[in-house]
Swiss-Prot record:
Assigned EC number: 2.7.6.3, 2.5.1.15
Gene Ontology molecular function, alphabetical: 2-amino-4-hydroxy-6-hydroxymethyldihydropteridine diphosphokinase activity; ATP binding; dihydropteroate synthase activity; kinase activity; metal ion binding
GO CC annotation terms, alphabetical: cytosol
Pathway linked to the protein: Cofactor biosynthesis; tetrahydrofolate biosynthesis; 2-amino-4-hydroxy-6-hydroxymethyl-7,8-dihydropteridine diphosphate from 7,8-dihydroneopterin triphosphate: step 4/4; Cofactor biosynthesis; tetrahydrofolate biosynthesis; 7,8-dihydrofolate from 2-amino-4-hydroxy-6-hydroxymethyl-7,8-dihydropteridine diphosphate and 4-aminobenzoate: step 1/2
Record's protein name: Folate synthesis bifunctional protein
Protein family according to the UniProt entry: In the C-terminal section; belongs to the DHPS family.
Reactions accelerated catalytically: 6-hydroxymethyl-7,8-dihydropterin + ATP = (7,8-dihydropterin-6-yl)methyl diphosphate + AMP + H(+); (7,8-dihydropterin-6-yl)methyl diphosphate + 4-aminobenzoate = 7,8-dihydropteroate + diphosphate
Keywords: ATP-binding, Folate biosynthesis, Kinase, Magnesium, Metal-binding, Multifunctional enzyme, Nucleotide-binding, Transferase
Gene name per UniProt: folKP
Amino acid sequence: MTTWNFVCLGLGSNLGNRHEYIKRAYESLKKAGIRNLKSSVILETKALLLEGSPKEWDLPYFNCVAIGETQLSPDELVKEIKMIENRLSRDSSLKWGPRSIDIDVLLYGDESYSCCSERCIIPHPRLLERPFLLSMMASLCPYRYFRLRGSPYDGKTFAELAAIYPLTEKDVLGSFAPTTQIMGIVNVTDDSISDTGLFLEAKRAAAHAERLFAEGASIIDLGAQATNPRVRDLGSVEQEWERLEPVLQILAESWKDAKQYPDVSIDTFRPEVIRRAIQVFPIRWINDVSGGSLEMAHLAKDLGLRLLINHSCSLPPRPDCVLSYEESPVTQMLRWGESQLETFAQIGLDTSWQVVFDPGIGFGKTPVQSMQLMEGVAKFKHILKCPVLIGHSRKSCLSLLGRFSSQDRDWETIGCSVALHNQGVDYLRVHQVEGNRRVLAAAAWSGMPV
C-alpha cells in the first residue's frame, strides 16, 4: 500500500498578480494529489539577486510555505511541480530572474529523510539562508526537527531555528492572508454613499486605484454608476462610459509596462460598457450587480473574463423589495445561486473558478438578513463549489452595531472581514484596503487550509 508522506513546500511569485498566481499554484498542487494542504501567511520580501543582476529583476516577492501530504516520491513531486510552473507561465530560462511562480520542495518524509539527486536536494540547500522561510515554517510545524548530518543545526526545531535566524522588520515589506484576496473599490460617481464625488475626476480615480493596489488589493473594481438605495435615476450607457473611459485610459498608460499589477474589474450591469472597456484596457472581471444576465454571461465566456454575480432584488435597492421573512436568507441565496450556476454551466462557463458568487449584502436584504448572510459563507462554498465574494464594506447593516456615518464604519467592516476570512471567503470587496489586509494577515499567521 502506498504511504502518505509529509511535504513542506516554498512558493514565491514576483510577476503579474502575485496573489492570484499563488492561489492557482495551490489549486494545481491539490489536483496533483497533495492532501491536507495548509498555507502560512504570505510575506512580501525583497528579491534575492546575484551580484550584477539586471536592475529590472529587483521586484518584491510574495513568499509562503505550505505543508501537506503526498504519495509521490520526491522526484515525481518535482516533476509535477515543474509542469505546474510551466502551466502558470514560469520562464525557467533565466536563473534567479523574475518568475510568475516558483515552487521548491523544502522538506519531505520523516525528519530523518534526506536526498541529493539530479532533480532535488532535501532539505533544501538554502533553507537556513532564508529567515522568512524559517519564520513561516515555525508557524506551521514549530516542533519538527531539522535534520542534516554534519550541520551545527542538526536536531534543532524550527521554532529554535526561527529564533537563531530571526525575521526582522526590515525583512518584511508586507503580509497577506493566503486564502482571502482583497478587491479595492473605486467609485467614479457623484452619488456614492461612502465617498460622494471624491473620485469623479479621472486622474483622482486612477491615482486612487494605484494607491489601493500599493496597499495590497489584488483586484481593483471600477464603477461609474451608483446603485445604492438613494439613487433614483440609473443614468445612461453614455454617461457611465463618459466617466469610466478616461480612468481606463490613464491606467492603461500607467500599467502598460508594469511587471506587477492587479486584476481590473468593471462594476456594471450593462454589457455595452464591458464591450467598450475591453477595447481600452485588459480587464479581467465583470462585476454584475444585476446578478448575471445571460447576455453578460455569454460576454464573459467569449472574452474569457471572470463573472461576479451579485444578487439584488431590485436596482436600485428598495426597502419594500427584500427577501422573504419566512425562510432563512442563506437558504434563499443558495437556491438562487444553484439556479444561476446551472444556467452558466450550460452555456460553457467553468463555474469552479470563472463565476464568483456574491449574495449581495444590502441589495434587497434587511440589516438582519445581511448579517445572517455573512454567517453563511462556509455553507455557500461547500454547496455551490465556486469562489465566494462578500461586499460588506461600510454597508448600512453595520448600523446594527452603532450609529456611525458610512465613512466611519471601517472598524466594523474589518471585524466582519476577520469572521468572513475564518469561514474561508475567497474575496472581500472593501474601501479601506490596508487595514483589512493587515488584520487578515495577522489572523492567518498560524496558517490556513487551502
